[in-house]
């Protein structure tokens, strides 16, 4: 993983988990706004780090925990997670012993949809996408 930080290390900490297809720097505009009051931590998953290999979700969580410890973070005021990052954040939240003040999920995919339901929904999803195409997005 790669970690970027903004703000004062002694300020309350905010941890961001990024969405799929982007890096931790995608949260930088928000972190820049918060950096005067918070220590913002923006990890980038090993999937997006050149020369690193993704091992597992548990390994990603371990790396986040180790980094927080190395920075002296003893409490997280806020954890922010978007899309697939919410899945990693949930794994982090269920295993960490750090106290957490608040959590904000944006578009987390937590639904457990069975194979039968997925098979049944596929034709409808196909038609929905096709109808958007036919209507030219309107």
Residue ranges of model-derived segments:
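Active-site signature of alpha/beta-hydrolase-fold catalytic machinery across serine-
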Residues: 29, 91-95
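Gly/Ala-rich beta-loop-alpha elbow adjacent to hydrolase catalytic centers
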Residues: 80-89
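A generic structural motif
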Residues: 36-40, 74, 99
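Conserved HGGG/HGGXW glycine-rich cap/lid loop of the alpha/beta-hydrolase fold
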Residues: 4-50
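Active-site loop/oxyanion-hole signature of alpha/beta-hydrolase fold enzymes
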Residues: 41-78
